[in-house]
Regions:
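A conserved beta-strand element that flanks and buttresses the S-adenosyl-L-methionine
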Residues: 118
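A short, conserved alpha-helix within the catalytic core of class I
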Residues: 126-136
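Conserved alpha-helix/loop element of class I SAM-dependent methyltransferases that forms part
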Residues: 25-44
Length: 228
């Protein structure tokens, strides 16, 4: 099944609220667990960059798990960022998770480089996947750690519908439709390997971790270390 692109930004306020209220406990907890397991050299403190943060649930989970870290959380949707800022204030995390509106690759992050760059479910929204990988290189330095998790495009629309029924059976129809569209827009591991090679990031590991998710992870090498 060929990829079917979807809108890059979730700009509608109603859609953003529905997304923010959805039950992502299992995949978001899994994101943090996998990050902890794979990035065993993560230092005890630092500043992370969250690319495509949405309403911030991953960033909130990250700083609760790693209490000496803070996060600059970037997204291009004002509706998502407003929900994230409100949630940060309610939970007292507004000084540790800082939300910034930014459209990639045009805009800048608050810092020139970061100790960790992570992203959850941004890649499948991008018409040009190079945007994610070039942004990762742009804000990294030697030994910056990278962790990306996203969906895998299934082999058919029927399989996509099966995954929606299995994992979003109790969600509102707007979210079921979003999930289905996201599966159709996702990339496959072979495509991601090509993307990493073209971005000179093929030293990063790629791993399928469920029937619908992959992760990319590892450190950025020093500038004089050749890409694999």
């Amino acid at each position: 099944m060929d990829r079917v692109a979807e809108p890059e930004l979730m700009l509608d306020a109603h859609q953003a609220r529905a997304y923010a209220s959805a039950d992502f406990e299992e995949p978001h907890s899994r994101f943090i667990d996998l990050l902890k397991q794979r990035l065993i050299d993560l230092p005890p403190n630092g500043v992370a960059l969250d690319l495509g943060c949405g309403p911030g649930d991953i960033s909130f989970r990250f700083v609760r798990t790693f209490p000496q870290w803070s996060v600059d959380a970037l997204d291009g949707s004002p509706a998502m960022l407003e929900l994230g800022r409100r949630a940060a204030e309610r939970s007292g995390l507004e000084t540790r998770v800082r939300f910034h509106e930014a459209s990639l690759p045009r805009d800048s992050a608050p810092s020139r480089s970061y100790d960790l760059i992570f992203s959850n479910s941004l890649l499948h929204h991008l018409r040009d996947p190079e945007v994610l990988w070039s942004s990762t290189r742009r804000w990294s330095r030697a030994a910056t750690l990278v962790f990306v998790m996203d969906l895998i495009r299934p082999e058919s629309r029927g399989r996509a519908s099966d995954l929606v029924d299995r994992y979003a059976f109790s969600e509102p129809e707007i979210l079921r439709t979003d999930f289905h569209n996201s599966l159709l827009a996702a990339y496959r591991p072979s495509e991601i390997r090509d993307q990493l090679r073209e971005a000179s990031l093929s030293h990063l590991e790629i791993e399928v971790v469920s029937d619908r998710h992959f992760i990319v992870w590892g450190p950025i090498p020093s500038v004089n270390q050749p890409d694999a």
